[in-house]
Design a protein with these regions (language model features):
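C-terminal secondary-structure termini that scaffold catalytic or DNA-interacting sites
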Residues: 162-176
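Short amphipathic alpha-helical linker/capping segments at the junctions of internal repeats
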Residues: 63-68, 152-155, 165-169
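C-terminal catalytic core of Y-nucleophile DNA break-rejoin enzymes
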Residues: 29-46, 62-84, 98, 102
Length: 176
């Protein structure tokens, strides 16, 4: 759920793999925040560090993510190029022209599933929104609402109820 620029600017001292969290400093809204990460992501990051330390280069130990030259991970276009290669390897078509998929879509997907999980665990949506906003580094919940759109995945029971009501109101339409 972090921004590309936040990942690029992570320093080794910001990454706490034993405790499963990142410290995001001076983000888009000039705020710092702590972002928990999963054990599986910590494990992947440990593997990354293992191989990074074996690069036959003089590396800049300050930044966590490095380019193949050993310096801070480069410009966004380099990251986008790698993302497109990953999409291709996964068999996911890249349509380009801002139609995606985009790296930023991962942030939207994370937001949607985080909200769905909180709702499934019994949290009220309106109480969950500020939690998610803080996690994403948003100043307001309005920014977060842009990321979280109500969808069928989040509320299957509501969908069933609405479908039943629609069948009563518009019986001539086919449903299901």
């Amino acid at each position: 759920g972090i921004r590309i620029s936040e990942a690029r600017n992570l320093q080794d001292t910001d990454v706490h793999l034993d405790e499963n969290y990142l410290v995001i400093k001076g983000a888009k809204n000039m705020t710092d925040r702590i972002v928990p990460i999963s054990q599986s992501l910590s494990n992947v990051c440990r593997q990354y560090v293992y191989y990074r330390e074996r690069l036959p280069l003089k590396i800049d130990k300050k930044y966590f993510f490095l380019s193949l030259s050993g310096r801070k991970c480069g410009a966004n276009h380099t990251i986008f190029r790698w993302f497109r290669l990953i999409l291709k390897d996964a068999g996911i078509p890249f349509t380009g022209n801002h139609h995606g998929p985009r790296i930023h879509d991962l942030r939207h997907t994370f937001s949607l599933y985080a909200m769905e999980k909180m709702t499934r665990e019994g949290s009220d949506m309106y109480h969950s929104m500020p939690v998610l906003a803080t996690y994403l580094g948003h100043k307001t919940t309005q920014s977060t609402e842009h990321y979280v759109r109500l969808c069928r995945v989040m509320f299957p029971e509501l969908e069933r109820k609405v479908e039943f009501i629609n069948q009563q109101i518009y019986p001539e339409l086919e449903y299901g």
